Amino acid sequence: MPVSRMRMRPWLEMQINSNQIPGLIWINKDKMIFQIPWKHAAKHGWDMEKDACLFRSWAIHTGRYKVGEKDPDPKTWKANFRCAMNSLPDIEEVKDKSINKGSSAVRVYRMLPPLTKDQKKERKSKSSREARNKSKRKLYEDMRMEESAERLTSTPLPDDHSSYTAHDYTGQEVEVENTSITLDLSSCEVSGSLTDWRMPMEIAMADSTNDIYQLQVSPLGSSSEDEDEMKSNIIKLLEPTQDWHTTSVEGKGFFTNEPGTQTMCSTFGYKEQDGEIDTSSAELEFRMMDQKSSLDFSWLDTVRPMQAISCSL
């Protein structure tokens, strides 16, 4: 049979009023606000009689620790005390006044007024209603999971697997269509000669290498010959055109390269026997004629006659 003990709130009030635990005091007794020393053991170190005496007293009160039977465990005492404080419905923490760091760390709590019978009943009914709803919801989910599992495991597989295939009427339609196609093909006449509808096409094939083809490729010429021919053509294009023409003025023959001048025949005596030119009757002189000048050639008399150049007309 469990040992009856005082609940935490009256026990805590008795400890505060006794003033036997250092740091456990009332801040505002009218508002039921008090503080508890809450030093961090790992960072600042604990004094068993000063910092952990409240947690040890609660462990002894709940029977979790007995002096001489177990080794002291201040961290476990503090964790158990914190869980018990958080589970109380009529005590809440005043977080804006608590100090969580440093050697003077404390937690401030407020004791709420005791609940009336109506509040207790309402709270109890609310909690019981929430518990019932939760249990019903869980039961419904479990039933659904069990039904789905049974449906998967208990579904029998048929011995005849013909139901997995397509229906028979589709195959019948296909067979009828195939029969009609076969009948149509049997009525057709197949001719072995295709010359009636194919257009004639003649392909000329070369019988030997001597045949002349429409498309011939000339052999590539030598690169040196092409370069020489190209150079000579460029030189001819760059050189000025000098077409020498024979003309005769006052019985004298001349060579001229000016375009637009009048061309006259010179008086030459030509011997067919030896192919020489007789220049006794006329003297050939080079004269530069200007097509814009007049036909007055009186100034030519002052020019010294030059040696005649033979030419063949």
UniProtKB/Swiss-Prot annotation:
Residues joined by cross-link Glycyl lysine isopeptide (Lys-Gly) (interchain with G-Cter in SUMO): K271, K292
Residues annotated to bind DNA: 5-113
Basic and acidic residues bias: start-end ranges: 117-150
One Gene Ontology term of the molecular function aspect: DNA-binding transcription factor activity, RNA polymerase II-specific
Any single GO BP term: immune system process
Superkingdom of this protein's organism: Eukaryota
Primary residence: nucleus
Post-translational modification: Phosphorylated by CK2 and this positively regulates its activity. Sumoylation represses the transcriptional activity and displays enhanced resistance to protein degradation. Inactivates the tumor suppressor activity. Elevated levels in tumor cells. Major site is Lys-271. Sumoylation is enhanced by PIAS3. Desumoylated by SENP1 in tumor cells and appears to compete with ubiquitination on C-terminal sites.
InterPro entries, sorted: Interferon_reg_fac_CS, Interferon_reg_fact_DNA-bd_dom, IRF1/IRF2, WH-like_DNA-bd_sf, WH_DNA-bd_sf
Record localization: Nucleus; Cytoplasm
Segments of this protein annotated with the region Disordered: 110-162
GO cellular component, one term: cytoplasm
This protein's UniProt keywords: Activator, Cytoplasm, DNA-binding, Isopeptide bond, Nucleus, Transcription, Transcription regulation, Ubl conjugation
Gene3D superfamilies in UniProt: Winged helix-like DNA-binding domain superfamily/Winged helix DNA-binding domain
Pfam families named among the record's database cross-references: IRF (PF00605)
Protein family: Belongs to the IRF family.
Function: Transcriptional regulator that specifically binds to the upstream regulatory region of type I IFN and IFN-inducible MHC class I genes (the interferon consensus sequence (ICS)) and activates those genes. Acts as a tumor suppressor.
PANTHER family: INTERFERON REGULATORY FACTOR, INTERFERON REGULATORY FACTOR 1
Protein name: Interferon regulatory factor 1
Gene that produces this protein: IRF1
